[in-house]
Amino acid sequence: MIFIPVMKEFFDIVVIGGGHAGCEAAAVAARMGAKTALVTMDSEQIGAMSCNPAIGGLGKGHLVREIDAWDGLMPHAADYAAIHYRMLNRSKGSAVQGPRIQADRNRYKKAIQTALKEQAHLTIIEGMAESFQMDKGKVKAVLLADGRPLKTESVVLTTGTFLDAWLFCGEKKWRGGRIGEQPSIGLAEQLKALDLPLGRLKTGTPARLDGRTIDWARLQRQPSDEDAWTMASYGAGRVAPQIACSLTRSNQKTHDIIRAGLDRSPLFSGAIEGRGPRYCPSIEDKIMKFGDRDGHQIFLEPEGLDTPLIYPNGISTSLPEDVQQAFINSIEGLENTKIVQFGYAVEYEFIDPRSLTHQLELKALKSVFCAGQINGTTGYEEAAAQGLVAGISAACAVAGKAPPVFDRRNSYIGVMIDDLVLQGVTEPYRMLTARAEYRLGLRADNAVTRLSGQAKAFGALGAEMTDFVTKRLAEREKCQKLLEKAASSRDMQAVGANVTEGASHSLFEWLRFPAVTRQHLEALIPELTEFSDAVVSEIIDDGRYAPYLERQDAELARLAGHDNMPLPAELDYATIAGLSNEMVEKFSAARPPDMASASRVRGVTPAALAAILIHAKKVTL
């Protein structure tokens, strides 16, 4: 509900900001029984997708599934809004596959708003959070711009890109946290006055195109996946009509137009000081850094079923409007395309995440938790996952109990938080599978098994999810029990498996052999056909990955004992398998002489250290 009058009641938790982080924080805190208020400048913009109309992707899809394991909002809203499903990295193993959906913006926002309005213990309040009321170094209330105080002793800050924010398009610069919306100035000033470590980052968005003016017949179509996977582990499934996306490319003419306009770009004129996201660079950055390429992919993504708007993924820009129009019209299929809204950049304040605990609580200001872009991250999924953790942590603090543990072994959420609070950021942080050294066990398909038991114990699941998790975990245990049955190689050969191993193994252990398929198991245990596809597929993947998990754990255990191992001065980090471009850049610049020095390079991940150790051992043998 919307609560408007003067506030006289006390809230256990006040969440500031109605973006993806704020929505998850407010929802989980309320599910856990905390009396929660969600403060937003405009209730109609709650859950808005500010940039690309998509959820998931490589690494990001894992986060969404982990949010689902805690009964979060994002996965169900994604399925309600999904107009295009695509499993990324499908040709690779399930550990690094990335579920991604294209969303109808309005349907997504509607799903989030409906879920929040129906959530018990949650009040939605329209207003601008201006400052904290403090007493002896502790927050006692959140003061709104119109003078209303919201009494509370626990706050979750999810200000997104609104904190002391500026918008840029060419030579134009104006105040705003998002197009058409005001920034948060008062709160930014108070955070500065509290002497918190702040910095500035930048992000951007491309122009929005009129799809009726695109020559679709000349473009490569990309249909939705036909198999029926979804983002949420339970629910109504795919409910919206599925439509195709299309693909085009920039060309040399496009690049020449962009180069000619760079002197009017705020990215290169010095107007923008904050660093932008490495893994979602502007088209200006692409042309400057990869000028030798003859073209860059551009995915034309519909913004919804009832709108002609198209999101051109791959050409984020803050170039002047005339340059944007010219370079877009130089692209195949877009020669006559009209721009409905020009691209722009936003620069905003963030808090150095090293000032946070692993519960995302400010060390210097107890009971104030931070989530999302205020912590130096980029992306809806990263924000939502942090919001989930901040909401859980705040609710646990209110209840006087220890919070759950998200660590590098049990979740991508734990990897992200560990990276943030220990290493900090020099650019907007994006989740990648390469950041997780235990990624072989952190598959998107086993998030419920990994995390939902803990979520249930903390009272974070609604009634439907509680029932689903109880049944799913029981079904999995029963299925796993069946696969303990022993079978000889002769048994396996009798059902068509091409194996030569002479020993007898459990059926689960036989899954280590690529020649053994689900059909072979069902021939030996017909009862397997009675189990859900999700459970059987998950356990089969467990079996497939078992030997690799053993090897992974052994390598990581050995890592601790190799601090003094020298690293060749001429080591080519670009040739190391599993090392991201970001890590290649950091290590190539630092040139650490040994593994101990490598571990102290800012931003290094345990996964990167493991990859370097494995490579170094090979080249020194």
Curated annotation (Swiss-Prot):
Keywords: Cytoplasm, FAD, Flavoprotein, NAD, tRNA processing. Its main location: cytoplasm. Signal peptide: none annotated. SUPFAM superfamilies: FAD/NAD(P)-binding domain. One of its GO terms (cellular component) is cytosol. It is found in: Cytoplasm. One of its GO terms (molecular function) is flavin adenine dinucleotide binding. It comes from the Bacteria. GO terms for biological process: tRNA methylation; tRNA wobble uridine modification. FAD binds at G17, G18, G19, H20, A21, G22. NAD(+) binds at residues 276-290. Its cofactor is FAD. Coiled coil: none annotated. NAD-binding protein involved in the addition of a carboxymethylaminomethyl (cmnm) group at the wobble position (U34) of certain tRNAs, forming tRNA-cmnm(5)s(2)U34. Belongs to the MnmG family. Homodimer. Heterotetramer of two MnmE and two MnmG subunits. This is tRNA uridine 5-carboxymethylaminomethyl modification enzyme MnmG.
